From Swiss-Prot:
KRAB domain residues: 41-127
Highest taxon of the lineage: Eukaryota
Example of a GO biological process term: regulation of DNA-templated transcription
Organism in which the protein naturally occurs: Macaca fascicularis (Crab-eating macaque)
The keyword Zinc belongs to this UniProt entry's keyword annotation: yes
Protein name: Zinc finger protein 561
UniProtKB keywords: Isopeptide bond, Metal-binding, Nucleus, Repeat, Transcription, Transcription regulation, Ubl conjugation, Zinc, Zinc-finger
InterPro entries: KRAB, KRAB_dom_sf, Zinc_finger, Znf_C2H2_sf, Znf_C2H2_type
Gene3D superfamilies: 6.10.140.140, Classic Zinc Finger
GO molecular function, one term: zinc ion binding
UniProt crosslink position (Glycyl lysine isopeptide (Lys-Gly) (interchain with G-Cter in SUMO2)): 273, 424
Localization per Swiss-Prot or TrEMBL: Nucleus
Length: 486
């Protein structure tokens, strides 16, 4: 089958006034194709016809599939047997649908089952869609014709006095100008493929039908979020409820097993996976699985070494933005998580969770070697290394090894002499933020660690631990040579 040479679709530097009846564009396309290729098949030879009743039964997706197939056929035909006469005389309803697609640049969605024909009272042209007629009427109403701008956002017209070889058509969204309408039709199809769902009121295009559905609320029965600081226009009631839930903290979705609440269904669905143990996102490097794609993406950065989130205070980089946020608090001193029992504040929620166990006395992680219990699993893992003698973290400067990476990081600062944490009261500098916090208590007199037996208070938790051994009689340090415990 012969194909159409569309190399004539060149761009022009000068703006073009694109207003004229679409019938002239149709005539030019037909004449050009008919004169260029005499022995090719016609549009009617490849067209698939539906009766009005059959067409009404198609949903929006099926109509767009029909459009895509017929447009592809149209672009590959050497001639098109479209008679330039009012569309009301045509027997094929689909051809009217397709022609409006090509020559108006507007994608149509039918909200009714019947096929209603609308005619222009000024020139008599007939349209198969009311909004196509509205778009056409703007040409009669003098829509900015002297300035060379398109009326609407996705409207295609041709110049009144144009002929083949001149600048004919301009598509407003991208500003490209073509010398012949078929070239513009191909260009339109490329752009429309990216945003196939068009608003019939303003012509705005959307990639997804749901986005168009939300947008239509601006023109019709929009529901404004009741919170003034939000000022969002939300159409579906479910979206409005979800927006309100964000402001009020109300969580309407609940799990049946534990009763935990969420603001929307997607959060609920993700949470249910934690109960089922589903981990459908697998790392191709190490085989580790994760519950969601975001966790997998964070994990992949461990293999790549990419740390895109950098601290503006010290230059330290992190793989996740949440890690950077928590780190910045070590510089700013912000501690948003406060213990309701003793008032101690923490920069991270995990720190507060661990601290709360000190009040409850809960230590769920127990060492199988010696029976010692810990509040966190990481503390248990680090403790087990005492029994195994494992010290996997080595200092590159002196070769000294450590049980944990945090201890190695602290040790490295002894080589660099860095003391980034400075007391604002006396100017004394410290290697670690924890030591600065302890030092600050010498100025404030704060002693948050209290002995439950005698009520004596301490500024440091380690001093409280030593003091408690007086009451318990515990002597954990044993001299192996003399068999003496201290």
């Amino acid at each position: 089958m012969a194909t159409i040479d569309l190399s004539h679709g060149f761009f022009s530097r000068e703006p073009v006034c694109p207003f004229e009846e679409k019938t002239k564009a149709e005539r030019m396309v037909e004449d050009y194709l008919a004169n260029s290729y005499q022995d090719s098949v016609t549009f009617d030879d490849v067209a698939v016809d539906f009766t009005p009743e059959e067409w009404a039964l198609l949903d929006t997706t099926e109509k767009y599939l029909y459009r895509d197939v017929m447009l592809e056929n149209y672009m590959n035909l050497a001639s098109v047997e479209w008679e330039i006469q009012p569309r009301i005389k045509r027997s094929s309803f689909q051809q009217g649908f397709l022609k409006n697609q090509i020559f108006s640049g507007i994608q149509m969605t039918r909200g009714y089952s019947g096929w209603k024909l609308c005619d222009c009272k000024n020139c008599g042209e007939v349209f198969s869609e009311q909004f196509c007629l509205k778009t056409h009427m703007r040409a009669h109403n003098g829509g900015n014709t002297s300035e060379g701008n398109c009326y609407g956002k996705d409207v295609l017209s041709v110049h009144k006095e144009a002929s083949i070889g001149q600048e004919l058509s301009k598509f407003n969204p991208c500003g490209k100008v073509f010398t012949l309408t078929p070239g513009l039709a191909v260009h339109l199809e490329v752009l429309n493929a990216r945003q196939p769902y068009k608003c019939k009121e303003c012509g705005k295009g959307f990639k997804y039908f749901a986005s168009l559905d939300n947008h239509m609320g601006i023109h019709t029965d929009e529901k404004l979020c009741e919170f003034q600081e939000c000022e969002r226009a939300i159409t579906p009631s479910s979206h409005l409820k979800q927006c309100v839930a964000v402001h009020t903290g109300k969580k309407s979705k609940k799990t049946k097993k534990y009763g935990k609440s969420f603001t929307n269904f997607s959060q609920l669905y993700a949470h249910v996976k934690t109960h089922k143990g589903e981990k459908s996102f697998e790392c191709k490097e190490c085989g580790r699985s994760f519950r969601n794609s975001s966790c997998l993406n964070d994990h992949i950065q461990i293999h790549t070494g990419i740390k895109p989130h950098k601290c503006t205070y010290c230059g330290k980089a992190f793989t996740r933005s949440t890690q950077l946020t928590e780190h910045v608090r070590t510089h700013t001193g912000i501690k948003p998580y406060e213990c309701k029992e003793c008032g101690q504040a923490f920069a991270q929620y995990s720190g507060l969770s661990i601290h709360i166990r000190s009040h409850s006395g809960k230590k769920p992680y127990q060492c199988k070697e010696c029976g010692k219990a810990f509040t966190t699993s990481t503390s248990l893992i680090q403790h087990i290394r005492i029994h195994t003698g494992e010290k996997p973290y080595e200092c590159v400067e002196c070769g000294k090894t450590f049980i944990t990476s945090s201890r190695r990081s602290k040790h490295l600062k002894t080589h660099s002499g860095e003391k980034p944490f400075v007391c604002k009261i006396c100017g004394k500098a410290f290697l670690y933020s924890s030591r600065l916090n302890v030092h600050l208590r010498t100025h404030t007199g704060e002693k948050p660690f209290v002995c439950k037996e005698c009520g004596k208070a301490f500024a440091v938790s380690s001093r409280l631990s030593r003091h408690e051994r007086i009451h318990t009689g515990e002597k954990p340090h044993e001299c192996k040579s003399m068999s003496v415990t201290i």
